[in-house]
Amino acid sequence: MIIVISGPPGSGKSTVAKILSKNLSLKYISAGHIFRELAEKEGLSLLELNKKAEENFEIDKKIDREIFRIASTEKNIIIESHIGGWLLKDIADITVYLNASIEIRAMRIAKRDNIPFTKAIEQIIEREESHSRRFLAYYGIDLSDLSVFDLVINTDNLQPDEISKIIEAYLNFMLAKNIH
């Protein structure tokens, strides 16, 4: 079973993927974690590495190759990745897109990173613009095209455990119908 969770920053990808990993006994893989490790190793902030990645496609390719390798060789995993749904749509059993309003996402990020709300908004806008430019230029991926996803969930008014229950119910429905 390969489940891919995608979505913009602050949508709840990591939190929900970790809950599902535990509930379904799946190995948790985070593209964001790999990206953050690279930023730390390079002595850069996430925004700085995003800007560097706009100039150097190899940064994204390296991370995406590693995620693709893992998805191609391991089973029983859940992958959390901004663009995983697009890149892994032919490998994944189920692709899920989580979204939330920019205000809710900024509140979550401000709380998580202990930064002012306005700074969180600025970071979200910068990261999303960087992602949109890079992924369209490098892969031809339009981040507004959600047609590749099996399930799209607005997380504004839902708790992480509620979101995971929705995904688990969908998964059980699809398995019962033998569709994936």
Swiss-Prot record:
One family name in Pfam for this protein: Cytidylate_kin2
GO molecular function: ATP binding; CMP kinase activity; dCMP kinase activity
EC id: 2.7.4.25
GO biological process terms on file: pyrimidine nucleotide metabolic process
Keyword tags: ATP-binding, Cytoplasm, Kinase, Nucleotide-binding, Transferase
Protein origin, superkingdom: Archaea
InterPro entries: Cyt_kin_arch, Cytidylate_kinase_dom, P-loop_NTPase
Catalytic activity: CMP + ATP = CDP + ADP; dCMP + ATP = dCDP + ADP
Positions bound to ATP: G7, P8, P9, G10, S11, G12, K13, S14, T15
Main location: cytoplasm
Listed SUPFAM superfamilies: P-loop containing nucleoside triphosphate hydrolases (SSF52540)
Any GO CC annotation of this UniProt entry: cytoplasm
Compartments where located: Cytoplasm
NCBIfam families the UniProt entry points to: cyt_kin_arch (TIGR02173)
Family designation: Belongs to the cytidylate kinase family. Type 2 subfamily.
Protein name: Cytidylate kinase
Organism: Sulfurisphaera tokodaii (strain DSM 16993 / JCM 10545 / NBRC 100140 / 7) (Sulfolobus tokodaii)
Taxonomy of the source species: Archaea, Thermoproteota, Thermoprotei, Sulfolobales, Sulfolobaceae
